[in-house]
Design a protein with these regions (language model features):
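Canonical Radical SAM [4Fe-4S] cluster-binding loop centered on the CxxxCxxC motif
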Residues: 22-62
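Conserved phosphate-binding and hydrolysis motifs of nucleotide-dependent enzymes
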Residues: 42, 83-84
């Protein structure tokens, strides 16, 4: 039984008049476009992403477009995407280009799936945008053995190629 379940069983909690706070402004929007699917299985992952975790499905381009339209009315200035691993999403390049039409974008990734062809596509997307495209690369250490112990065999080599 979770804390929410315990709280709901408590009459004092159930009887609280909790006000609803409308969302009228939002500066930053985080989108979990990679769902919980990841090519790695890091020991510390806070949502246990991995190759078989489909708890939260990847966002589709249509899902992203809906959130972007909402974000415009809320005044969002910055966008972040995360997962799982965002580069497992088949629509990732279209998603990146579309988000960049709205504002600067930070991509959280382990970069192990980036090939030279994908890097060239990313460069083209950045060059066609007036907004900045940045990457936040997740690694545990500059030490290959330590990194691989946490993220999986050969993850350091794949990320640094």
């Amino acid at each position: 039984m979770g804390l929410c379940d315990i709280g709901l069983k408590n009459k004092a909690v159930r009887d609280l008049d909790i006000p609803e706070v409308p969302l009228v402004k939002l500066d930053t929007l985080w989108l979990q476009v990679g769902g919980t699917l990841c090519n790695l299985q890091c020991t510390h992952c806070f949502i246990s992403c991995g190759p078989q975790n489909h708890t939260h499905e990847m966002m589709t381009m249509k899902d992203v477009q809906q959130r972007l339209l909402e974000s415009k009315t809320l005044g969002v200035k910055d966008y972040y995407i995360t997962g799982g691993e965002v580069f497992m999403n088949a629509e990732i390049f279209e998603i990146l280009a579309t988000i960049l039409e709205y504002g600067p974008l930070d991509v959280l990734t382990n970069v192990t799936l980036i090939t030279s062809e994908k890097a060239a596509r990313l460069k083209k997307i950045q060059n066609n945008s007036s907004h900045k495209l940045q990457f936040r690369v997740s690694m545990e250490s500059f030490d290959e053995k330590l990194n691989d112990r946490t993220r999986g065999k050969n993850s350091f080599r794949k990320a640094t190629e």
